[in-house]
A protein has these predicted regions:
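Bacterial extracytoplasmic/cell-wall-associated proteins, especially those involved in peptidoglycan
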Residues: 2-90
Length: 90
């Protein structure tokens, strides 16, 4: 369960902020955690990251998930950095 949560947060950091400085990457990770803590959002990091598509309206909380492209990270260094950020915030 924790591994899945870390992967979801890391994917979100990767796709939303991989070209940003570390501060921006941490901010994206904290957005997910803040939403998990908010009653208006699901209480699960993966459900927060993937929220929206299930309603069939094509609008997700994070646009990379609804863009129709592969969700497999291609930039190794950026993916490793995103995983590190996820581990540090959790």
């Amino acid at each position: 369960m924790i591994a899945e949560m870390l992967t979801c947060i890391a994917l979100n950091v990767y796709y939303e902020a991989r070209s940003e400085p570390l501060e921006g990457q941490y901010a994206v990770a904290h957005v997910v955690l803040n939403r998990v803590a908010d009653d208006k959002f699901p209480n699960d990091a993966c459900k927060v990251v993937y929220q929206g598509l299930e309603k069939g309206i094509g609008r997700c909380q994070f646009s990379w998930y609804c863009d129709g492209k592969s969700d497999t990270p291609r930039e190794r260094r950026a993916w490793l950095d995103s995983q590190l950020v996820a581990h540090k915030v959790v």
